[in-house]
From Swiss-Prot:
Active site: N393, C395, E397
Subunit structure comment from the entry: Heterotetramer composed of a homodimer of the large subunit (R1) and a homodimer of the small subunit (R2). Larger multisubunit protein complex are also active, composed of (R1)n(R2)n.
Organism the protein comes from: Alcelaphine herpesvirus 1 (strain C500)
EC number: 1.17.4.1
Record's keyword terms, sorted: ATP-binding, Disulfide bond, DNA replication, Early protein, Nucleotide-binding, Oxidoreductase, Viral latency, Viral reactivation from latency
Site for Important for hydrogen atom transfer, residues: C193, C409
InterPro entries given in the database record: HSV_RIR1 (IPR034717), NrdE_NrdA_C (IPR013346), RNR_lg_C (IPR000788), RNR_lsu_N (IPR013509), RNR_R1-su_N (IPR008926), Rrm1 (IPR039718)
GO terms for biological process, alphabetical: deoxyribonucleotide biosynthetic process; DNA replication; release from viral latency
Name of this chain's protein: Ribonucleoside-diphosphate reductase large subunit
Residue positions binding substrate: T177, S192, C193, G223, N393, L394, C395, A396, E397, P595, T596, V597, G598, S599
Amino acid sequence: MASAEATPQQQIDQLKVNAGWDMKSNIKAGLLHHEEMEKKATKTVTEYIEKFADVLEENVLRFLQDNAEMLELCIYMYEQLPAYKAVKSRGILSAKRFYDTYVLRTADGSCYESVSHCFMRIAAFCTVQVLTNSALKITILYLGRDKLFKDLPCSPTMDLFIYFFSPLSHQLVCCATPIMRSAGLRDANLASCFLINPDLSTEKSTTTALLQELTMLLSAKSGVGCNVTSFGVDEKCIQSCVGLINSQVEFFNDQNPRPVSVAAYMEVWHSQIQEFLAVKLPENPSRCASIYQGLCIPKLFFEKFIEDPGQNWYLFKPEKSGNLANLYGDEFRSEYERLVGIGCYADAIPIKSLMFLIINTIIKTGSPYIIYKEACNEHHWKNMEGCAIASANLCAEVIQYPGADVSTCNLANVCLPMCLVTVSNDSHSPLEKTYCGNVIESQAVSGVGFSMPILHAAVEVAVFLVNCAIAGGKCVTPGMERGQRERSMGIGVHGLADVFAEMGYSYLDERAARLDVEIFENMYFRAVKTSNNICRLGGGRPFEGWGESKLRHGFFHWQGWEDVNLSIPITEWEKLSRRCISSGVYNSQFIALMPTVGSSLLTGFSESYYPYFANISSKVSSKEEVMKPNMTFWNRVSKEDLDTVRFFSGDVALFPEPLKEKYSLFLSAFDYCAEKQLARARLRAPFVDQSQSHSFHLKEENVVSARFLKDLILSGYTLGLKTIMYYCKVKKQSTMSSFQCLRDQNKSEMTGNDQGVEPESYIKCTAAGGETSEACLHCQ
């Protein structure tokens, strides 16, 4: 059928064929999909109220009703801006994502929320929360912001609305999935993820924790990080415990458009650590395929492994483990040695054998995540002596201590490419009287700069947005309500690789490294400053637990790390320190670098702080597979290079030499040295007071040897990273796609070695057996 005679859907299907490499086709397909969906979407605020009044929270509904005329004008003016066209021009995958996942729809599916009204709903929710919280309201109005629509006569209430609507609708600030989908709805949970540390010491406490608390949390359609180290019920096997968790995950994922999961964490001294590592192995007939695993490894394990890989590592039953679970550092060592000395251990295993089991599990399943116990505790916002952290969340970037309560992940992220500007003569002039940084000019591309003032403004909005979500979200259990009193937040980023490429830097370039660290220093500075302003200017009460906070004494997270180079003048840090001591801060934590898969699909930019995953990849849903191009890359590909680039599927590492150099900025994460990526994570770590979802991106040849992974894990330990490994992904040699590390192990070639690992086996790469490469999209 000729294109002119085709239906819109047929045109979209035709265009999708080339969407992976032809940006005109990709953008046109997205625009057509928006056009088709807008036929079924709300056109006016009045219609929106009529269609969705029954699901909107009462105060949000009233706000929309009371301000309908001004909101209508605001939406109209926004839709005349280039920003609106840009949102609709992100490609077919972005368009699909909006309507399949994020916007509201009526129960019968006959009417959808328009994209503009989706942003309106979130901004209206935030405005309502600010109006009911005097500290937030006073602070925002005091700080002030230039109006987006300068000709629009606004009341203070509408000023507050525009304060949120502008960065949201421009996609400068992006929400985590629960906020994007549910802000402004009745009884909505807005937390991305939960952390629990349940008592699993008896049958009764285990069933109470897993069939009541965990069930309620999963019913909120979010992920959970669960510490299972206390499990030791009447000689029951950890397989049954994890199986109980796995069955619940599968139940909640049945017909659920947004999958949830649980990451079960265990400390490596547990007597059932070997059984725990086996619960997800492909050869396990009772394999728990729907959950994820994590290990909390203490400094002592690494020290002993390095000292003598052949020595024993002792394992303990929880009820005979003394106080190991609550200790770290020298106190952990003393307790461990005391227990070994009096013979309280249940078993012993050569430490190199346990390391090999860990690596074997990583190679076959892509996990367990690995967090470093001492780093998590020593760099926490308060002194953790006697109550150690031993787990993280579902994506391993949120580090909190839930105790008997429920810790929560309250997340948002900044789209870093939106901070790129054309450099002009006055680019270095600050936008406000207080410190907000300057525009950093590219040293490789003329006229391009990264605006720290825009970044500061974005982080400030993100702080208020997350606080609105904390205040206005439903707490699904009493433990969650108690945990939210710490007001922990996690502000992340996406599109860092695009920023580097636009500024002419390869990912591991020294100039990129400096900009990388400066970005996160400025983010941490502005987040703490804004949180302090809520107390200092708005009169807000500091979070519960402020008296124990290191910030109470003016001690910043970066001060606990060595070799930190600051770009912000020390006088600014000292001023902020004094203000924190004097007035307090509203939130306990600030920066967490999550994967941001969802946000990057909407904007078309790269995920999180990672290098590019691929220049052509795909996203598979229950409905279809849609190509995901690296739009920054394909917009650079010249017409004469197109055939060659397509022949090699956009894999720059395979290009012939002239083109490889020409497009060297677009190498993938698999092409960069994994150890150097870990070193970069260490450079930004002082300004990331939670953690980073740091994945290993490896090539097939890297994992034929257990030694390579062993060295990476030890490197993460040496660097002192909180999250040494979130996920391990391996790129198959034969395809453009990349896969997590599920492997078939065959043709065992056992060879002795003295490198501290078990004899190596030949490993054949296969695609991950139907699993997603990320644990959960709610964090992202």
